[in-house]
From Swiss-Prot:
Gene3D superfamilies: 6.20.10.20, Adenovirus pIV-related, attachment domain. This is Fiber protein. Induction: Expressed in the late phase of the viral replicative cycle. GO terms for biological process: adhesion receptor-mediated virion attachment to host cell; cell adhesion; symbiont entry into host cell. The lineage of its organism: Viruses, Varidnaviria, Bamfordvirae, Preplasmiviricota, Tectiliviricetes. Forms spikes that protrude from each vertex of the icosahedral capsid. Interacts with host receptor CXCAR to provide virion initial attachment to target cell. Fiber proteins are shed during virus entry, when virus is still at the cell surface. It comes from Human adenovirus D serotype 9 (HAdV-9).
């Protein structure tokens, strides 16, 4: 004989099998549905849990697609938009390479040919060059930095006679930058002090010829007591001295009789606008013409004698004595002693040119 289970009239036979009085109990997910991927939202509705890039579009599960991705019509495949040099090969995104690029050890690199190299920590310790592409240079070629970046340049040795002209051509002689000639310019403007400032024009040209210096000198006195020689009224005036003193770099010193601003490398018929910083190659050789020391022997070769003529007249001679490295307070020196034995009356001191040579320091 069977029995019937007695239940209350308000029992709800639909899961969760509650009673009418339990209406505040939230709707529960049926026990046969996993909570992984499902949710009870809104209450009483079984729905999917969605996380980006999954979305519901027009009631369908869809995929949010950003830039660079596309869903193909018809096939529904998700593909990558590849613009050159990117490309799809065998369902893989890659990069199209052309010389000089390559992939080595799974890394994009640059193929460097002859004369080029990629500097690494194994090849150089200079931090400024590491991981950069550089030009390998040999003798005579170098690099330098400019406002527009690095440049490859030809290395021109100082004092070698080579330079670049205004067109950028390498020349052995540049009339606008003649560093084979130190001079005072050929004009007659005063540049020297004998007795008073700018009382004379000393014309001196030093031209480097290998190990020798070819020199030419002349003098015009334009003011002061030596302008007109009159030994009847000034019998004691029988000579004077002009000294050129140079420092260890061959730069003319302020204590010289010749004005420093009038002495420089040649630029056509003038001098270069920028003062020179080094001219040792024009200096008298310290071995051939040693500086005087206690007990040292003085040789006749240290002196160059010659005759110049006042007003260009052969009967008005003046002796010019040139000595080298005999002055103190300097590294190098050239000294000109002008003297005359003849009695001159109202003769203007304007000399002919005198040419001589001496052994160069370099």
């Amino acid at each position: 004989m069977s029995k019937r289970l007695r239940v209350e009239d308000d029992f709800n036979p639909v899961y969760p099998y509650g009673y009418a009085r339990n209406q505040n109990i939230p709707f529960l997910t049926p026990p046969f549905v996993s909570s992984d991927g499902f949710q009870n939202f809104p209450p009483g509705v079984l729905s999917l849990k969605l996380a980006d890039p999954i979305a519901i579009v027009n009631g369908n599960v869809s995929l949010k697609v950003g830039g660079g991705l596309t869903l193909q019509d018809g096939t529904g495949k998700l593909t990558v938009n590849a613009d050159p040099p990117l490309q799809l090969t065998n369902n893989k995104l890659g990069i199209a390479l052309d010389a000089p690029f390559d992939v080595i050890d799974n890394k994009l690199t640059l193929l460097a040919g002859h004369g080029l190299s990629i500097i690494t920590k194994e090849t150089s310790t200079l931090p400024g060059l590491r991981n950069t592409l550089v030009v390998l240079t040999g003798k005579g070629i170098g690099t330098e930095s400019t406002d527009n970046g690095g440049t490859v340049c030809v290395r021109v040795g100082e004092g070698g006679g080579l330079s670049f002209n205004n067109d950028g051509d390498l020349v052995a002689f540049n009339k606008k930058e003649d560093k084979r000639t130190l001079w005072t310019t050929p004009d007659t403007s005063p540049n020297c002090k004998i007795d008073q400032d700018k009382d004379s024009k000393l014309t001196l040209v030093l031209t480097k010829c290998g190990s020798q210096i070819l020199a030419n000198v002349s003098l015009i006195v334009v003011d002061g007591k030596y302008k007109i020689i009159n030994n009847n009224t000034q019998p004691a005036l029988k000579g004077f001295t002009i000294k050129l003193l140079f420092d260890e770099n061959g730069v003319l010193m302020e204590s010289s009789n010749l004005g420093k601003s009038y002495w420089n490398f040649r630029n056509e018929n003038s001098i270069m606008s920028t003062a020179y910083e080094k001219a040792i190659g024009f200096m008298p050789n310290l071995v051939a013409y040693p500086k005087p020391t206690a007990g040292s022997k003085k040789y006749a070769r240290d002196i160059v004698y010659g005759n110049i003529y006042l007003g260009g007249k052969p009967d008005q001679p003046v002796t010019i004595k040139t000595t080298f490295n005999q002055e103190t307070g300097c590294e190098y020196s050239i000294t000109f002693d002008f003297s005359w034995a003849k009695t001159y009356v109202n003769v203007e001191f304007e000399t002919t040119s005198f040419t001589f040579s001496y052994i160069a320091q370099e």
